[in-house]
C-alpha cells in the first residue's frame, strides 16, 4: 500500500509504473482469487493506456455536446418530478436516478432496465457484510447476470458499426475486442461504478 499526495511525487509515480504498479489491484484489500475482475484501472501501461483510450471517446467534449439536449431533457424531467413543499430523499430521487440515466445513455443501455445498473454497482462494491447481498455466492451470481446481460449487448453491437456508446467502443476496440469475459465484466464494473 502506498499513498502519494504531493504533485512532484505523483508525477514520479506516474512515470515509474514499474515500481508503483497498479496490477493486480488498486485497493488495500487483495483481489479475489476465485472471482478475479481485471479492469484497466488496475493495469499498467501499455495495456491500461490502450484500454482506457478505447472508451475515453464516449465522454469526449464532442460526444458530450451531441448528448447535451438528451442530458438537459432528462435533468429537467427529474427535477420537474420532485415534490414541492414536502420532504423527499434527494439521493434516491435525484442523485441515483440522474446518474443511472446518464450511465444508460453512455452505454446505450435499455432505458427501461436502467435500475439494473444501480443494483450491479451496489453488488460490485458491497459484500455480504454490507447487507446488499446475503453471501459471496449471491454476489458472484448477480455479477454473472450482469455479464450475461452485457454480453448480449456486446454481441449486438459487435455486429453493428462502431458507435459512440461504451459497449460499442469495447466491442470494436483493438485493445478490448478480445477480452476474456472476466475482464469484460471487470471493465464494465469499473465504468458503472
Regions found by a protein language model. Give the residues of each.
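Short, contiguous clusters of charged residues that form electrostatic/catalytic patches at enzyme active sites
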Residues: 69, 73, 148, 186
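Central I-helix of cytochrome P450 enzymes
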Residues: 96, 104, 146-147, 173-193
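Active-site substrate-recognition loop segments, prototypically the cytochrome P450 B′-helix/B-C loop
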Residues: 1-91, 100-118, 122-132, 136-141
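Non-catalytic, well-ordered alpha-helical scaffold segments
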Residues: 11, 49-53, 96-101, 144, ...
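Cytochrome P450 catalytic core segment centered on helix I
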Residues: 78, 119-177, 181
Amino acid at each position: 500500500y502506498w499513498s502519494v499526495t504531493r504533485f512532484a511525487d505523483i508525477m514520479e509515480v506516474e512515470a515509474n509504473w514499474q515500481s508503483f504498479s497498479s496490477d493486480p489491484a488498486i485497493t488495500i484489500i487483495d483481489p479475489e482469487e476465485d472471482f478475479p475482475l481485471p479492469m484497466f484501472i488496475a493495469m499498467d501501461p501499455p495495456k491500461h493506456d490502450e484500454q482506457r483510450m478505447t472508451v475515453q471517446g464516449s465522454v469526449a467534449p464532442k460526444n458530450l455536446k451531441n448528448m447535451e439536449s438528451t442530458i438537459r431533457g432528462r435533468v429537467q424531467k427529474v427535477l420537474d418530478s420532485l415534490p414541492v413543499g414536502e420532504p423527499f430523499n434527494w439521493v434516491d430521487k435525484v442523485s441515483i436516478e440522474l446518474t443511472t440515466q446518464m450511465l444508460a445513455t453512455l452505454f446505450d443501455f435499455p432505458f427501461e432496465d436502467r435500475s439494473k445498473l444501480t443494483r450491479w454497482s451496489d453488488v460490485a462494491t458491497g459484500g455480504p457484510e454490507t447487507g446488499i447481498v446475503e453471501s459471496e455466492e449471491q454476489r458472484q451470481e448477480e455479477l454473472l447476470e450482469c455479464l450475461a446481460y452485457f454480453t448480449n449487448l456486446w454481441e449486438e453491437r459487435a455486429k453493428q458499426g462502431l458507435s459512440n456508446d461504451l459497449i460499442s467502443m469495447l466491442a470494436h476496440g483493438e485493445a478490448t475486442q478480445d477480452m476474456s469475459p472476466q475482464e469484460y465484466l471487470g471493465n464494465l464494473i469499473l465504468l458503472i461504478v
